[in-house]
UniProtKB/Swiss-Prot annotation:
SUPFAM superfamilies: NusB-like, S-adenosyl-L-methionine-dependent methyltransferases. It is found in: Cytoplasm. This is Ribosomal RNA small subunit methyltransferase B. S-adenosyl-L-methionine binds at C254, A255, A256, P257, G258, G259, K260, D277, D303, D322. It catalyses: cytidine(967) in 16S rRNA + S-adenosyl-L-methionine = 5-methylcytidine(967) in 16S rRNA + S-adenosyl-L-homocysteine + H(+). Signal peptide: none annotated. GO terms for cellular component: cytosol. GO terms for biological process: regulation of DNA-templated transcription; rRNA base methylation. It comes from Shigella boydii serotype 4 (strain Sb227). InterPro entries: MeTrfase_RsmB-F_NOP2_cat, MeTrfase_RsmB-F_NOP2_dom, NusB-like_sf, NusB_RsmB_TIM44, RCMT, rRNA_ssu_MeTfrase_B, rRNA_ssu_MeTfrase_B_ent, RsmB-like_ferredoxin. The active site is at C375 (nucleophile). Belongs to the class I-like SAM-binding methyltransferase superfamily. RsmB/NOP family.
Amino acid sequence: MKKQRNLRSMAAQAVEQVVEQGQSLSNILPPLQQKVSDKDKALLQELCFGVLRTLSQLDWLINKLMARPMTGKQRTVHYLIMVGLYQLLYTRIPPHAALAETVEGAIAIKRPQLKGLINGVLRQFQRQQEELLAKFNASDARYLHPSWLLKRLQKAYPEQWQSIVEANNQRPPMWLRVNRTHHSRDSWLALLDEAGMKGFPHADYPDAVRLETPAPVHALPGFEDGWVTVQDASAQGCMTWLAPQNGEHILDLCAAPGGKTTHILEVAPEAQVVAVDIDEQRLSRVYDNLKRLGMKATVKQGDGRYPSQWCGEQQFDRILLDAPCSATGVIRRHPDIKWLRRDRDIPELAQLQSEILDAIWPHLKSGGTLVYATCSVLPEENSLQIKAFLQRTADAELCETGTPEQPGKQNLPGAEEGDGFFYAKLIKK
């Protein structure tokens, strides 16, 4: 039996690590969840994701409720108060329980002398809630995005930025990919129905299913046997443009955690696939996914800027480059991105993408296909990136995705309930 822990203090410390230390919630949360009971795992996740999703609102409220900010060793208390405010605003937890558990969190973070302060701030919010929220809703903080990102979205999408922001602030649906080597989508949907769950097929992507209600993966029919994989619908769109064929040599570059590698092998089981990623730790997830689905691929650690180091002079029939990016298209799924990214990251990422494109292009066979993909919505990483590449690369031709003036296909967050995603299909003349 697992020791009873204070979930509010755990959530506060996790959020602090994201915001103050730049750590990814994807790395922080799983080890914390191992320390709590199964019934508490979901609440811990809800508190962490929820606070990060609404961080700018909670920060704004604390600045109004407190005379001066908590600093130094007391900074964790700032995030503990955020957790308390989030519960009062967005959860069905009874207010008295939310207050009591949050105040007790002060003991867990070794600040028992501040219990009175935490209690006082939260009770003050309860008294002034209506007035404070009216003022908040008249401020730019209501968009729940950092100002630098808001400015970029407003510039890139003058007519659509508000709908993008709204989609980013929603909870994401759970999308699945049915393994067509085991089941047709319709036959797996019938199994899902028998298991008491409901799913909906995507109109454009032939393997994609959206669950009516998110569910644990172990509850999904055949998950352990590789019948189905969790993957957003927009990410599945890569296969529409890549169109892998049996017998081809295909490179999946920047492949971790392996969702697209295994999708290639589902579509073309006899393809020779090489999966490469710079992050050796994340490659372990590629191996895990291949094993669960009973598939084989050549997996290598390598830097996309220096392909000769890991593939020599080898050329490929098709290349999928899922380029490192700002991930601004998947904020609803990873709200910590809003606070991990900085404005200065964008030109640096664009430069890295450009270097990888230039380095990998010679490894594409004449007549071959390269699909450039990102989970970003920023033009500097997407249409402008491809436009510049086409201008400097004489034997590259845009195919099926956009025009030379506006290259690529941009999915915006929430469109057809998918994530924000960009694709450009290039052919080597």
